[in-house]
């Protein structure tokens, strides 16, 4: 008997994942933090096919850090999920290294097993001081606190949609090996120009499929202006969820590229003589379900707020 047959960790088809993640996002909009915590801790206790819970946070330079907690340990230690902040660039000095993670239960994503591994579920986390006060360099936490106050005091919800460009380059770990070989393009096509089954198109298709499974509301995807450059567009979300989308988008692209023997890089200017990569960000504000940037009778439909 093969060892793989002894394991029965959670692996969910992409179409089911999409439904689960969309429902989780809708649930997060309606339920409070305590209610979500009760629901998901109960689910984790019951779901025998989950082996680990992945918690994510970002450092001050935007790197995504991921810690896998054994499910049972996490459930027993929710008030004391410690990590060494001195090992994170720009965080605490060594003598103040004791930081905590607080699970943001509204951020749950049921992840494709072929991207993150079977038997895992992922949450973003807030970084906390030892006394569980918000850590000053947790910019996601700062954004979350600001938007919650904006909603509470003014009834305003902030939305964003990001258009993230990147390059697909030849070989795994190409960024780490740049000093040896530089970057090598995998496609000579340009804007909207890629044959249906060439390497860049296959990469875009696979990445977009994983994003859809994660609950991204995909709109369009295409090769960008420069050779080997890509962009995949998806719909807006509240700004905290939109920020999470940026990190997940990059994670998915990197994992997909790696599985194909290549590297997805989001460096702003990796090549001389051709376009670099950027990230247009579209913002809007909503109050009582209405876009307060819009006013039909004003010039160009723009309100005073805009």
Regions found by a protein language model. Give the residues of each.
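Detector for methionine-enriched segments
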Residues: 1, 20, 66, 197, ...
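ATP/Mg2+-dependent ligation/transfer catalytic cores
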Residues: 1-220, 242-245
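Structured core elements
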Residues: 54-56, 66-68, 124, 167, ...
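Short, charged/polar low-complexity linear motifs in solvent-exposed/disordered segments
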Residues: 82-85, 236-237, 259, 283
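Secondary-structure junction/capping motif
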Residues: 134-142, 172, 238, 258, ...
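Histidine-centered divalent-metal-coordination microenvironment in nucleic-acid enzymes
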Residues: 163-177, 223-237, 267-289
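Accessory "access/gating" subregions that flank catalytic or transport cores
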Residues: 195-200, 204-218, 232-239, 250-266
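Glycine-rich anion/phosphate-binding loop at the beta-strand->alpha-helix junction
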Residues: 241, 246, 250-306
